[in-house]
Amino acid sequence: MTAIRRRIMGLETEYGIANMQDSSRRLGPDEIARKLFAPVVEKHRSSNIYTENASRLYLDVGAHPEFATAECDSLHQLIAYDRSGDLMFHELADRAEQAVGGKVYLLKNNTDSLGNSYGCHENYLVSRDIPLKGLSKQLLPFLVTRQLICGAGKLAIPYPGAPNENFGPGYTMSQRADHVWEGVSSATTRSRPIINTRDEPHADSSKYRRLHVIVGDSNMSEVTTALKVGSTLLVLEMIEAGVALPDFEMANEIRSIREISRDFTGQVDIALRSGSTATPLEIQRAFYDAACAYLASREDPERGTPNAELTPVVDLWGRVLDCFDTGDFSPVSTEIDWVIKKSLLDRMAAARGLDPIDPRLAQIDLMYHDIHPTRGLFNVLARRGLARTLLAPETIEQAVRQAPPTTRAAVRGRFIAAVRANPELSYTVDWMRVKVNGEGGAEALLADPFANTSEDVDRIIESLESR
Protein backbone atom coordinates (compact mmCIF):
# COMPACT_ATOMS: atom_id res chain seq x y z
CA MET A 1 0.00 0.00 0.00
CA THR A 2 0.97 3.67 -0.25
CA ALA A 3 2.62 5.22 2.78
CA ILE A 4 0.63 7.89 4.61
CA ARG A 5 2.77 11.02 4.38
CA ARG A 6 0.13 13.28 5.85
CA ARG A 7 -0.67 11.52 9.11
CA ILE A 8 -2.94 12.61 11.94
CA MET A 9 -1.02 12.55 15.24
CA GLY A 10 -1.50 13.49 18.85
CA LEU A 11 0.26 13.33 22.21
CA GLU A 12 -1.36 12.72 25.60
CA THR A 13 0.69 13.84 28.59
CA GLU A 14 -0.03 13.12 32.24
CA TYR A 15 1.77 15.37 34.72
CA GLY A 16 2.99 14.61 38.19
CA ILE A 17 1.80 17.09 40.81
CA ALA A 18 3.23 18.12 44.18
CA ASN A 19 2.89 20.95 46.65
CA MET A 20 5.10 22.45 49.33
CA GLN A 21 3.62 24.83 51.90
CA ASP A 22 6.82 25.05 53.94
CA SER A 23 9.67 22.69 54.84
CA SER A 24 7.38 20.31 56.74
CA ARG A 25 3.84 20.83 55.45
CA ARG A 26 2.21 19.98 52.14
CA LEU A 27 -1.18 19.26 50.60
CA GLY A 28 -1.93 15.81 49.20
CA PRO A 29 -2.15 15.22 45.43
CA ASP A 30 -5.96 15.05 45.40
CA GLU A 31 -6.34 18.32 47.27
CA ILE A 32 -3.77 20.23 45.25
CA ALA A 33 -5.28 18.85 42.01
CA ARG A 34 -8.65 20.27 43.05
CA LYS A 35 -6.98 23.62 43.70
CA LEU A 36 -5.27 23.44 40.31
CA PHE A 37 -8.53 22.81 38.46
CA ALA A 38 -10.65 25.21 40.53
CA PRO A 39 -10.55 27.99 37.86
CA VAL A 40 -11.45 25.45 35.16
CA VAL A 41 -14.42 24.13 37.13
CA GLU A 42 -15.54 27.64 38.04
CA LYS A 43 -15.54 28.74 34.41
CA HIS A 44 -16.73 25.57 32.68
CA ARG A 45 -18.48 23.62 35.48
CA SER A 46 -16.28 20.63 34.69
CA SER A 47 -12.70 19.42 35.16
CA ASN A 48 -12.82 17.81 31.70
CA ILE A 49 -12.85 20.40 28.92
CA TYR A 50 -11.78 21.14 25.39
CA THR A 51 -9.64 24.25 25.25
CA GLU A 52 -9.80 27.14 22.79
CA ASN A 53 -7.03 25.48 20.76
CA ALA A 54 -9.27 22.38 20.41
CA SER A 55 -7.17 20.20 22.70
CA ARG A 56 -8.47 18.35 25.76
CA LEU A 57 -7.45 19.31 29.29
CA TYR A 58 -8.70 17.25 32.19
CA LEU A 59 -8.01 15.63 35.55
CA ASP A 60 -7.22 11.96 35.06
CA VAL A 61 -7.44 9.06 37.50
CA GLY A 62 -4.91 9.32 40.34
CA ALA A 63 -4.96 13.13 40.53
CA HIS A 64 -2.89 13.47 37.36
CA PRO A 65 -3.53 16.57 35.25
CA GLU A 66 -3.60 15.50 31.61
CA PHE A 67 -3.37 17.29 28.30
CA ALA A 68 -4.24 15.69 24.97
CA THR A 69 -3.22 17.72 21.95
CA ALA A 70 -5.64 18.50 19.19
CA GLU A 71 -5.21 16.57 15.95
CA CYS A 72 -1.98 17.61 14.21
CA ASP A 73 -0.69 16.62 10.77
CA SER A 74 2.95 17.70 10.86
CA LEU A 75 5.86 17.18 13.22
CA HIS A 76 6.59 20.75 14.27
CA GLN A 77 2.88 21.48 14.61
CA LEU A 78 2.56 18.56 17.04
CA ILE A 79 5.50 19.78 19.13
CA ALA A 80 3.99 23.28 19.33
CA TYR A 81 0.67 21.93 20.61
CA ASP A 82 2.36 19.58 23.05
CA ARG A 83 4.22 22.57 24.48
CA SER A 84 1.00 24.60 24.57
CA GLY A 85 -0.21 22.18 27.24
CA ASP A 86 2.82 23.05 29.39
CA LEU A 87 1.97 26.74 29.15
CA MET A 88 -1.70 26.22 30.01
CA PHE A 89 -0.91 24.09 33.03
CA HIS A 90 1.78 26.49 34.20
CA GLU A 91 -0.79 29.28 34.22
CA LEU A 92 -3.13 27.11 36.31
CA ALA A 93 -0.27 26.17 38.67
CA ASP A 94 0.63 29.84 39.08
CA ARG A 95 -2.96 30.62 40.09
CA ALA A 96 -3.02 27.63 42.45
CA GLU A 97 0.17 28.86 44.15
CA GLN A 98 -1.50 32.18 44.85
CA ALA A 99 -4.57 30.39 46.22
CA VAL A 100 -2.74 28.02 48.59
CA GLY A 101 0.21 30.22 49.53
CA GLY A 102 2.81 27.59 48.67
CA LYS A 103 4.65 26.16 45.71
CA VAL A 104 2.81 23.94 43.22
CA TYR A 105 5.00 21.70 41.09
CA LEU A 106 3.84 20.19 37.81
CA LEU A 107 6.32 17.61 36.59
CA LYS A 108 6.48 16.41 33.01
CA ASN A 109 7.94 13.05 33.95
CA ASN A 110 6.66 9.47 34.21
CA THR A 111 7.33 8.13 37.71
CA ASP A 112 6.97 9.19 41.31
CA SER A 113 8.93 8.26 44.43
CA LEU A 114 6.44 5.50 45.30
CA GLY A 115 7.01 3.58 42.08
CA ASN A 116 3.83 4.73 40.33
CA SER A 117 4.02 5.48 36.63
CA TYR A 118 2.01 7.82 34.42
CA GLY A 119 2.41 8.23 30.74
CA CYS A 120 3.08 10.08 27.56
CA HIS A 121 0.94 8.36 24.95
CA GLU A 122 1.59 8.77 21.24
CA ASN A 123 -1.24 8.44 18.72
CA TYR A 124 -0.72 7.81 15.02
CA LEU A 125 -3.47 7.26 12.44
CA VAL A 126 -2.60 4.19 10.36
CA SER A 127 -4.36 2.32 7.59
CA ARG A 128 -6.56 -0.59 8.58
CA ASP A 129 -5.20 -2.42 5.51
CA ILE A 130 -2.08 -3.30 7.52
CA PRO A 131 -2.80 -6.16 9.95
CA LEU A 132 -2.07 -5.02 13.49
CA LYS A 133 -0.13 -8.20 14.24
CA GLY A 134 2.25 -7.60 11.34
CA LEU A 135 2.61 -3.92 12.14
CA SER A 136 3.39 -4.67 15.78
CA LYS A 137 5.92 -7.36 14.88
CA GLN A 138 7.95 -4.90 12.80
CA LEU A 139 7.47 -1.92 15.11
CA LEU A 140 8.17 -3.47 18.52
CA PRO A 141 11.96 -3.92 18.08
CA PHE A 142 12.19 -0.26 17.10
CA LEU A 143 10.11 0.89 20.08
CA VAL A 144 11.99 -1.27 22.60
CA THR A 145 15.34 0.15 21.47
CA ARG A 146 14.12 3.69 20.73
CA GLN A 147 15.01 4.74 24.29
CA LEU A 148 18.63 4.99 23.14
CA ILE A 149 17.75 8.08 21.13
CA CYS A 150 14.87 9.66 23.05
CA GLY A 151 14.69 8.44 26.66
CA ALA A 152 14.07 11.04 29.36
CA GLY A 153 16.51 9.44 31.81
CA LYS A 154 15.92 8.56 35.45
CA LEU A 155 17.85 8.02 38.63
CA ALA A 156 16.26 4.67 39.49
CA ILE A 157 16.25 3.69 43.15
CA PRO A 158 14.05 0.58 43.41
CA TYR A 159 11.97 0.30 46.55
CA PRO A 160 12.07 -3.03 48.45
CA GLY A 161 10.04 -5.67 46.66
CA ALA A 162 9.89 -3.73 43.39
CA PRO A 163 10.05 -5.82 40.19
CA ASN A 164 13.24 -4.01 39.18
CA GLU A 165 14.85 -4.39 42.63
CA ASN A 166 17.42 -6.89 41.37
CA PHE A 167 18.92 -4.24 39.07
CA GLY A 168 19.87 -2.06 42.04
CA PRO A 169 20.09 1.75 42.07
CA GLY A 170 21.51 3.61 39.12
CA TYR A 171 20.76 5.82 36.15
CA THR A 172 18.50 4.50 33.39
CA MET A 173 17.84 5.83 29.91
CA SER A 174 14.07 5.41 30.09
CA GLN A 175 11.52 6.23 32.77
CA ARG A 176 8.89 3.88 31.35
CA ALA A 177 11.09 0.84 30.71
CA ASP A 178 10.49 -0.62 34.18
CA HIS A 179 6.73 -0.08 33.95
CA VAL A 180 5.62 -2.00 30.87
CA TRP A 181 4.60 -5.63 31.12
CA GLU A 182 3.47 -6.76 27.66
CA GLY A 183 4.36 -6.12 24.06
CA VAL A 184 0.83 -5.67 22.71
CA SER A 185 -2.38 -5.55 24.78
CA SER A 186 -5.68 -3.72 25.22
CA ALA A 187 -4.79 -2.79 28.82
CA THR A 188 -3.31 0.58 29.83
CA THR A 189 -2.66 0.36 33.58
CA ARG A 190 -3.05 -3.09 35.13
CA SER A 191 -0.84 -4.83 32.55
CA ARG A 192 0.72 -1.88 30.77
CA PRO A 193 1.85 -2.75 27.20
CA ILE A 194 4.22 -1.13 24.73
CA ILE A 195 1.43 -0.85 22.12
CA ASN A 196 -2.18 -0.54 23.24
CA THR A 197 -4.72 -2.18 20.91
CA ARG A 198 -7.93 -0.56 22.13
CA ASP A 199 -9.76 0.19 18.88
CA GLU A 200 -10.83 3.83 19.03
CA PRO A 201 -9.72 5.42 15.74
CA HIS A 202 -11.75 8.67 16.10
CA ALA A 203 -12.11 8.39 12.33
CA ASP A 204 -13.71 6.09 9.74
CA SER A 205 -13.12 2.71 11.36
CA SER A 206 -13.37 0.92 8.02
CA LYS A 207 -10.30 2.82 6.77
CA TYR A 208 -8.19 3.66 9.80
CA ARG A 209 -7.04 2.54 13.20
CA ARG A 210 -5.30 4.61 15.86
CA LEU A 211 -1.91 3.23 16.78
CA HIS A 212 -1.60 3.95 20.50
CA VAL A 213 2.04 3.79 21.68
CA ILE A 214 2.32 4.07 25.47
CA VAL A 215 5.94 3.07 26.10
CA GLY A 216 7.50 6.46 25.43
CA ASP A 217 8.86 8.90 28.00
CA SER A 218 7.62 12.46 28.45
CA ASN A 219 10.30 14.73 27.04
CA MET A 220 11.27 18.17 28.25
CA SER A 221 13.44 18.75 25.18
CA GLU A 222 11.55 19.74 22.03
CA VAL A 223 14.49 18.38 20.05
CA THR A 224 14.16 14.97 21.72
CA THR A 225 10.40 14.99 21.11
CA ALA A 226 11.08 15.68 17.44
CA LEU A 227 13.44 12.70 17.29
CA LYS A 228 10.99 10.44 19.14
CA VAL A 229 8.03 11.23 16.92
CA GLY A 230 9.91 11.91 13.68
CA SER A 231 11.79 8.61 13.74
CA THR A 232 8.52 6.77 14.46
CA LEU A 233 6.81 8.53 11.56
CA LEU A 234 9.55 7.35 9.21
CA VAL A 235 9.39 3.76 10.47
CA LEU A 236 5.61 3.72 10.03
CA GLU A 237 5.94 5.08 6.49
CA MET A 238 8.55 2.44 5.66
CA ILE A 239 6.33 -0.36 6.97
CA GLU A 240 3.37 0.98 4.96
CA ALA A 241 5.51 1.34 1.83
CA GLY A 242 6.69 -2.26 2.11
CA VAL A 243 10.34 -1.42 2.74
CA ALA A 244 12.22 -4.59 3.63
CA LEU A 245 13.28 -4.28 7.28
CA PRO A 246 15.39 -6.87 9.13
CA ASP A 247 13.59 -9.33 11.40
CA PHE A 248 14.47 -8.35 14.96
CA GLU A 249 11.49 -9.96 16.71
CA MET A 250 12.59 -10.36 20.32
CA ALA A 251 12.24 -13.44 22.47
CA ASN A 252 11.27 -11.31 25.48
CA GLU A 253 10.54 -7.63 24.84
CA ILE A 254 9.93 -6.83 28.50
CA ARG A 255 13.21 -8.17 29.86
CA SER A 256 15.01 -6.62 26.90
CA ILE A 257 13.61 -3.13 27.42
CA ARG A 258 14.77 -3.14 31.06
CA GLU A 259 18.27 -4.39 30.23
CA ILE A 260 18.68 -1.88 27.42
CA SER A 261 17.69 0.98 29.72
CA ARG A 262 20.69 0.29 31.96
CA ASP A 263 23.33 -0.31 29.30
CA PHE A 264 24.97 2.85 28.00
CA THR A 265 27.11 1.05 25.45
CA GLY A 266 24.18 -0.14 23.33
CA GLN A 267 25.96 -3.49 23.13
CA VAL A 268 23.94 -5.75 25.44
CA ASP A 269 22.95 -8.94 23.61
CA ILE A 270 19.20 -9.22 23.01
CA ALA A 271 17.81 -12.69 22.37
CA LEU A 272 15.68 -12.92 19.22
CA ARG A 273 12.89 -15.39 18.43
CA SER A 274 14.99 -16.67 15.55
CA GLY A 275 17.52 -18.01 18.07
CA SER A 276 20.17 -15.43 17.24
CA THR A 277 21.02 -12.23 19.09
CA ALA A 278 21.32 -8.55 18.21
CA THR A 279 22.42 -5.47 20.12
CA PRO A 280 20.18 -2.41 20.63
CA LEU A 281 22.69 -0.35 18.68
CA GLU A 282 22.60 -2.83 15.80
CA ILE A 283 18.79 -2.73 15.74
CA GLN A 284 18.60 1.06 15.83
CA ARG A 285 21.33 1.34 13.21
CA ALA A 286 19.34 -0.91 10.86
CA PHE A 287 16.23 1.26 11.20
CA TYR A 288 18.34 4.41 10.85
CA ASP A 289 20.05 3.18 7.67
CA ALA A 290 16.68 2.24 6.17
CA ALA A 291 15.24 5.65 7.13
CA CYS A 292 18.14 7.47 5.46
CA ALA A 293 17.56 5.59 2.21
CA TYR A 294 13.80 6.08 2.41
CA LEU A 295 14.01 9.81 3.13
CA ALA A 296 16.40 10.32 0.20
CA SER A 297 13.62 9.29 -2.21
CA ARG A 298 10.59 10.43 -0.18
CA GLU A 299 8.30 12.70 -2.18
CA ASP A 300 7.69 15.91 -0.28
CA PRO A 301 3.99 16.04 0.61
CA GLU A 302 1.89 19.12 -0.14
CA ARG A 303 0.46 18.80 3.38
CA GLY A 304 1.86 16.87 6.28
CA THR A 305 5.40 16.62 7.62
CA PRO A 306 7.83 18.04 5.05
CA ASN A 307 11.23 16.55 4.37
CA ALA A 308 12.75 19.74 5.76
CA GLU A 309 11.46 18.74 9.23
CA LEU A 310 12.54 15.10 8.90
CA THR A 311 16.07 15.73 7.60
CA PRO A 312 17.33 17.16 10.94
CA VAL A 313 15.63 14.25 12.72
CA VAL A 314 17.59 11.70 10.73
CA ASP A 315 20.80 13.69 11.16
CA LEU A 316 20.38 13.72 14.96
CA TRP A 317 19.37 10.04 14.97
CA GLY A 318 22.67 9.15 13.33
CA ARG A 319 24.70 11.41 15.59
CA VAL A 320 23.24 9.81 18.73
CA LEU A 321 24.07 6.33 17.44
CA ASP A 322 27.60 7.49 16.63
CA CYS A 323 27.94 8.57 20.27
CA PHE A 324 27.21 5.00 21.38
CA ASP A 325 29.98 3.83 19.06
CA THR A 326 32.52 6.21 20.62
CA GLY A 327 31.20 6.32 24.19
CA ASP A 328 31.37 10.12 24.05
CA PHE A 329 27.93 11.77 24.24
CA SER A 330 29.15 15.37 24.36
CA PRO A 331 28.15 15.96 20.68
CA VAL A 332 24.46 15.56 21.70
CA SER A 333 24.71 16.85 25.27
CA THR A 334 22.27 19.72 24.59
CA GLU A 335 19.77 17.77 22.48
CA ILE A 336 18.82 14.44 24.10
CA ASP A 337 16.98 14.45 27.43
CA TRP A 338 18.65 11.46 29.05
CA VAL A 339 22.10 12.80 28.12
CA ILE A 340 21.34 16.35 29.30
CA LYS A 341 20.05 15.13 32.66
CA LYS A 342 22.84 12.59 33.17
CA SER A 343 25.44 15.30 32.55
CA LEU A 344 23.73 17.51 35.13
CA LEU A 345 23.57 14.74 37.74
CA ASP A 346 27.16 13.65 37.08
CA ARG A 347 28.44 17.21 37.53
CA MET A 348 26.53 17.62 40.78
CA ALA A 349 27.63 14.23 42.16
CA ALA A 350 31.28 14.93 41.33
CA ALA A 351 31.23 18.46 42.75
CA ARG A 352 29.68 17.41 46.06
CA GLY A 353 30.90 13.83 46.35
CA LEU A 354 27.38 12.37 46.33
CA ASP A 355 26.41 8.70 46.10
CA PRO A 356 23.82 7.69 43.44
CA ILE A 357 21.18 7.17 46.14
CA ASP A 358 21.69 10.59 47.72
CA PRO A 359 18.25 12.26 47.98
CA ARG A 360 19.70 15.51 46.68
CA LEU A 361 20.32 13.86 43.31
CA ALA A 362 16.78 12.47 43.29
CA GLN A 363 15.52 16.00 43.89
CA ILE A 364 17.53 17.31 40.93
CA ASP A 365 16.10 14.49 38.80
CA LEU A 366 12.56 15.62 39.64
CA MET A 367 13.24 19.33 39.23
CA TYR A 368 14.58 18.73 35.71
CA HIS A 369 10.94 18.00 34.78
CA ASP A 370 9.37 21.02 36.52
CA ILE A 371 7.50 22.87 33.73
CA HIS A 372 7.87 26.23 35.54
CA PRO A 373 9.59 28.51 32.98
CA THR A 374 12.07 30.05 35.43
CA ARG A 375 12.34 27.43 38.20
CA GLY A 376 12.41 24.15 36.24
CA LEU A 377 15.97 22.92 35.72
CA PHE A 378 15.55 22.06 32.04
CA ASN A 379 14.37 25.59 31.37
CA VAL A 380 17.27 26.98 33.41
CA LEU A 381 19.67 24.93 31.26
CA ALA A 382 17.96 26.13 28.08
CA ARG A 383 18.40 29.78 29.07
CA ARG A 384 22.10 29.12 29.70
CA GLY A 385 22.56 27.48 26.30
CA LEU A 386 23.02 24.01 27.83
CA ALA A 387 19.81 22.62 26.33
CA ARG A 388 18.70 23.38 22.78
CA THR A 389 15.15 24.38 21.88
CA LEU A 390 13.42 23.98 18.52
CA LEU A 391 10.47 26.36 18.34
CA ALA A 392 10.25 30.11 18.85
CA PRO A 393 8.30 31.09 22.00
CA GLU A 394 5.76 33.01 19.91
CA THR A 395 4.97 29.82 17.94
CA ILE A 396 4.04 28.03 21.17
CA GLU A 397 2.09 31.03 22.48
CA GLN A 398 0.10 31.13 19.24
CA ALA A 399 -0.66 27.43 19.64
CA VAL A 400 -2.21 28.18 23.04
CA ARG A 401 -4.69 30.57 21.44
CA GLN A 402 -5.45 28.93 18.10
CA ALA A 403 -6.42 25.42 17.00
CA PRO A 404 -4.30 23.65 14.37
CA PRO A 405 -5.60 25.17 11.12
CA THR A 406 -5.00 22.13 8.91
CA THR A 407 -7.10 19.39 10.58
CA ARG A 408 -10.53 18.70 12.10
CA ALA A 409 -9.29 20.61 15.15
CA ALA A 410 -9.83 23.88 13.26
CA VAL A 411 -13.57 23.13 13.03
CA ARG A 412 -13.77 22.20 16.71
CA GLY A 413 -11.90 25.38 17.61
CA ARG A 414 -14.33 27.58 15.65
CA PHE A 415 -17.29 25.87 17.29
CA ILE A 416 -15.82 26.32 20.78
CA ALA A 417 -15.20 30.02 20.15
CA ALA A 418 -18.76 30.51 18.91
CA VAL A 419 -20.54 28.75 21.77
CA ARG A 420 -18.37 30.35 24.46
CA ALA A 421 -19.33 33.75 23.06
CA ASN A 422 -22.85 32.83 24.24
CA PRO A 423 -22.39 32.06 27.97
CA GLU A 424 -25.99 30.94 28.40
CA LEU A 425 -25.59 28.08 25.93
CA SER A 426 -25.22 24.44 26.94
CA TYR A 427 -23.03 22.52 24.54
CA THR A 428 -21.14 19.26 24.15
CA VAL A 429 -17.78 18.73 22.47
CA ASP A 430 -15.95 15.50 21.69
CA TRP A 431 -13.25 14.42 19.25
CA MET A 432 -15.82 13.53 16.57
CA ARG A 433 -18.93 15.53 17.53
CA VAL A 434 -20.03 19.00 18.51
CA LYS A 435 -23.51 19.81 19.74
CA VAL A 436 -25.59 22.73 20.96
CA ASN A 437 -27.90 21.27 23.58
CA GLY A 438 -31.49 22.13 24.38
CA GLU A 439 -34.43 23.40 22.34
CA GLY A 440 -33.38 24.57 18.92
CA GLY A 441 -30.00 22.90 19.32
CA ALA A 442 -28.02 21.19 16.59
CA GLU A 443 -25.35 18.55 16.25
CA ALA A 444 -22.57 17.96 13.73
CA LEU A 445 -20.49 14.85 13.14
CA LEU A 446 -16.80 15.46 12.44
CA ALA A 447 -15.90 12.05 11.05
CA ASP A 448 -12.92 13.07 8.90
CA PRO A 449 -9.88 14.13 10.95
CA PHE A 450 -8.23 15.53 7.80
CA ALA A 451 -11.12 17.94 7.04
CA ASN A 452 -10.58 21.46 8.35
CA THR A 453 -13.98 22.73 7.18
CA SER A 454 -17.56 21.66 7.91
CA GLU A 455 -20.69 23.09 6.33
CA ASP A 456 -22.76 21.66 9.19
CA VAL A 457 -20.69 23.48 11.79
CA ASP A 458 -20.73 26.65 9.69
CA ARG A 459 -24.55 26.55 9.72
CA ILE A 460 -24.58 26.07 13.51
CA ILE A 461 -22.25 29.03 13.99
CA GLU A 462 -24.34 31.20 11.63
CA SER A 463 -27.48 30.36 13.58
CA LEU A 464 -25.75 31.30 16.84
CA GLU A 465 -24.55 34.60 15.42
CA SER A 466 -28.07 35.46 14.24
CA ARG A 467 -29.64 35.01 17.68
Curated annotation (Swiss-Prot):
Q: What is its EC number?
A: 6.3.1.19
Q: In which pathway does it act?
A: Protein degradation; proteasomal Pup-dependent pathway; Protein modification; protein pupylation
Binding of Mg(2+): at which residues? E12, Y58, E66
A GO BP term, please?
A: proteasomal protein catabolic process
Give the catalytic activity.
Answer: ATP + [prokaryotic ubiquitin-like protein]-L-glutamate + [protein]-L-lysine = ADP + phosphate + N(6)-([prokaryotic ubiquitin-like protein]-gamma-L-glutamyl)-[protein]-L-lysine
Q: Which UniProt keywords apply?
A: ATP-binding, Ligase, Magnesium, Metal-binding, Nucleotide-binding, Ubl conjugation pathway
**Which Pfam family is an annotated match for this chain, by its short name?**
Pup_ligase
Q: Name one GO molecular function term.
A: ATP binding
Q: Where is the active site?
A: D60
Q: Which domain of life is it from?
A: Bacteria
| Chain residues that bind ATP | R56, T69, W431
UniProt record similarity statement: Belongs to the Pup ligase/Pup deamidase family. Pup-conjugating enzyme subfamily.
Q: What is the recorded function of this protein according to its Swiss-Prot or TrEMBL entry? A: Catalyzes the covalent attachment of the prokaryotic ubiquitin-like protein modifier Pup to the proteasomal substrate proteins, thereby targeting them for proteasomal degradation. This tagging system is termed pupylation. The ligation reaction involves the side-chain carboxylate of the C-terminal glutamate of Pup and the side-chain amino group of a substrate lysine.
HAMAP family, sorted: Pup_ligase
Q: What else is known?
A: The reaction mechanism probably proceeds via the activation of Pup by phosphorylation of its C-terminal glutamate, which is then subject to nucleophilic attack by the substrate lysine, resulting in an isopeptide bond and the release of phosphate as a good leaving group.
Q: What is this protein called?
A: Pup--protein ligase
Gene source species: Corynebacterium jeikeium (strain K411)
